[in-house]
Amino acid sequence: MPHNSIRSGHGGLNQLGGAFVNGRPLPEVVRQRIVDLAHQGVRPCDISRQLRVSHGCVSKILGRYYETGSIRPGVIGGSKPKVATPKVVEKIGDYKRQNPTMFAWEIRDRLLAEGVCDNDTVPSVSSINRIIRTKVQQPFNLPMDSCVATKSLSPGHTLIPSSAVTPPESPQSDSLGSTYSINGLLGIAQPGNDNKRKMDDSDQDSCRLSIDSQSSSSGPRKHLRTDTFSQHHLEALECPFERQHYPEAYASPSHTKGEQGLYPLPLLNSALDDGKATLTSSNTPLGRNLSTHQTYPVVADPHSPFAIKQETPELSSSSSTPSSLSSSAFLDLQQVGSGGPAGASVPPFNAFPHAASVYGQFTGQALLSGREMVGPTLPGYPPHIPTSGQGSYASSAIAGMVAGSEYSGNAYSHTPYSSYSEAWRFPNSSLLSSPYYYSSTSRPSAPPTSATAFDHL
């Protein structure tokens, strides 16, 4: 390799075994060989291995070649030679005017083909785009004499001098007043003819100054005068915001007083009293609609103290109580007298009738004043179950709970069922004689173990 024979200066071997000289660029022959292999379609990694040049060096050389078309090394720390010479810029402008849709890389190839530039001095694609953007397509507000491409405009395009431009007509020059002016939008009276003429003159002067400033780069640059709002204009603009958009939400004080007069406080109190009267009366039963439902009147004074006393059950009570309970109790609620006659007070009443047994776990229930205490039975029992069956689960109570007459052998007397036989209702007649079927008749003898276990379920 030619670059391996370089021995001048500080050199060495790279990671691929190729010789290099520190601080010196790669030889011209190696650079050209890299470009040739790239044109042949060899990958940069293969070029790096074949020429024993680092991959970064190959990529940098190829990238610079694709960008500028030159394989010469750049000057480190120095400035590049100017490639956008006036001759090159003029040629680029000519190409672009002849074919406005021409791409930058086509312009670059044409510059090389016509010999305007060589591979070292040809501008890059990005440079050509920058030249087209900044020098060929001049902005409209640049001076006429400083434009490079002024002399070579297309025949169909002409530039109009600024002196021939008619200033825009002021919206207030109309004698009747423009609807789109500030005064027209705000509904303010138009000023006099003299004032309008002065305003028109000042607007036209400001427009002319702004346009003339574009044709002279030395003069001071003045912008169009912005419309300033007077105090009268500001007050007219603030008026819509001072009005209430929602009068119902923010009513005036007089409106509020009128509303209060329509609904005085005594009228509201009487309406509340009428509403209370329409509520459920004391005689209306609460809870479930039971056949043997009993109600009690509400105590007149809910704050009166109550005394809870225990009474022993009557001797004639036939209720069966479990043997585990030592004694049963009945609750009587009696209003404590306040010193008045006995007839004036509410007569004592029983919360539960004497026929119902009350266990110890029910003696601690809270008493709710103002509500009715209903039902002759304990909670959880249907109304048709006699009270004697609510005390325990003895066999006699279970026999009383299910009446055997309801399941007798007689046919139904009801018309829809009179045509059906006994076999239709009870296809298996052995169910009626089963020891587990409860009837009013005596139960047939069954094994004591099974009967006892069933009774205690």
Curated annotation (Swiss-Prot):
GO terms for cellular component: nucleoplasm; nucleus; transcription regulator complex. Residues 87-135 are annotated as: RED subdomain. Residues 159-182 have a biased composition (Polar residues). Expressed in the developing excretory system and the thyroid gland. It comes from the Eukaryota. Residues 9-135 bind DNA. GO terms for molecular function: DNA binding; DNA-binding transcription activator activity, RNA polymerase II-specific; DNA-binding transcription factor activity; RNA polymerase II cis-regulatory region sequence-specific DNA binding; transcription cis-regulatory region binding. The keyword Nucleus applies. Keywords: Developmental protein, Differentiation, DNA-binding, Nucleus, Paired box, Phosphoprotein, Transcription, Transcription regulation. Residues 12-68 are annotated as: PAI subdomain. Interacts with WWTR1. Thought to encode a transcription factor. It may have a role in kidney cell differentiation. May play a regulatory role in mammalian development. This is Paired box protein Pax-8. It comes from Mus musculus (Mouse).
